[in-house]
């Protein structure tokens, strides 16, 4: 049975020896600050799973819409959805991300996220 041993709703994150289904974990969405919204009515949700030596691992999700952000040092893997990430740095091309995309962001990078299908990712930051 593939889900055996998985904790369906880890309220306080994961404890050693437990797991969760990252694709179906229920998340609580909140509206983005109006100053960050470029278009639409996007919401985001975050669910920290573990803190490992000062590095946080968790699940983040954004609904369709466009929003600006200032990034933190992070690597993430897209689980579901689609988006385009535009960078303020003219030397960096826009990134189209979809399931399986692995992306590295740096502290202080300014971005604009255009989500066309609710985007869910696992982040390490």
What are the roles of these predicted feature ranges?
Residues 69, 85, 121-124:
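Short hydrophobic/aromatic-rich beta-strand segments that constitute the beta-sheet cores
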């Amino acid at each position: 049975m593939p889900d055996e041993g998985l904790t369906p709703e880890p309220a306080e994150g994961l404890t050693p020896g437990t797991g969760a289904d990252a694709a179906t974990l229920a998340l609580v969405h909140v509206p983005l600050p109006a100053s960050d919204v470029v278009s639409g009515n996007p919401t985001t949700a975050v669910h920290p799973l573990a803190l490992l030596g000062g590095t946080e691992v968790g699940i983040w999700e954004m609904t369709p819409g466009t929003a600006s952000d200032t990034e933190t040092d992070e690597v993430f893997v897209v689980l579901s959805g689609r988006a385009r990430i535009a960078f303020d740095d003219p030397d960096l091309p826009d990134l189209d991300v979809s399931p399986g995309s692995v992306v590295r962001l740096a502290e202080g990078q300014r971005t604009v996220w255009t989500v066309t299908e609710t985007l869910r990712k696992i982040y390490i930051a």
